């Protein structure tokens, strides 16, 4: 009986390891949960706890980008916008506004009450060059343990390319 229980547990563990999984909705400290990807008056953050693996395609991840509004119209100051984004790590494509909308909240980091949605057409982008979007996408893929464009160290390579570009400009 003990042997049967142990074999059953091992089998369930092995089956569980082979299934594509969602990343756990981790309770991260605020400073660990959000990665600032764009500085400025209205900084944009990657919500690392929102990264999910598509159950139909393990190379496809979804995540939220959050913009904290600290400038512009007084009515919007102190609010935030949340945008669902998807990335296919294998073929380096991203879909911005995957759910065709921005969600606007009363507080920073998509906290507080949801005020309204702003419709926005989803846009598919194929990333061939090093750009801010490709850096964000590679970061998401790396965080989820996926290769970006089938390259193990894609993020490091892109950072080196950016360093070379900035050296040639000076």
Language-model-detected regions and their locations in the chain:
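Sec-dependent N-terminal signal peptides
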Residues: 4-14
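Phosphate/pyrophosphate-binding loop motifs in nucleotide- or prenyl diphosphate-using proteins
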Residues: 2-5, 85
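Generic signature of intrinsically disordered, low-complexity, basic-rich segments
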Residues: 1, 14-16, 150
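N-terminal secretory-pathway/extracellular module detecting exported/lumenal segments
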Residues: 18-83, 88-170
């Amino acid at each position: 009986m003990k042997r049967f229980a142990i074999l059953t547990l091992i089998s369930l563990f092995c089956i569980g390891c082979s299934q594509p999984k969602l990343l756990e909705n981790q309770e991260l400290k605020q400073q660990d949960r959000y990665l600032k990807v764009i500085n400025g008056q209205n900084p944009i953050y990657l919500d690392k706890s929102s990264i999910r693996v598509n159950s139909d395609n393990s190379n496809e991840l979804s995540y939220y980008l959050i913009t904290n509004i600290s400038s512009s119209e007084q009515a919007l100051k102190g609010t935030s916008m949340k945008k669902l984004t998807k990335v296919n790590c294998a073929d380096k494509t991203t879909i911005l506004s995957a759910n065709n909308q921005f969600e606007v909240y009363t507080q920073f980091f998509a906290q507080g009450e949801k005020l309204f949605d702003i419709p926005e057409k989803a846009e598919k982008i194929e990333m061939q060059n090093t750009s801010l979007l490709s850096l964000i996408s590679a970061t998401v893929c790396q965080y989820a343990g996926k290769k970006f464009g089938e390259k193990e160290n894609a993020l490091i390579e892109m950072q080196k390319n950016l360093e070379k570009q900035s050296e040639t400009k000076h």
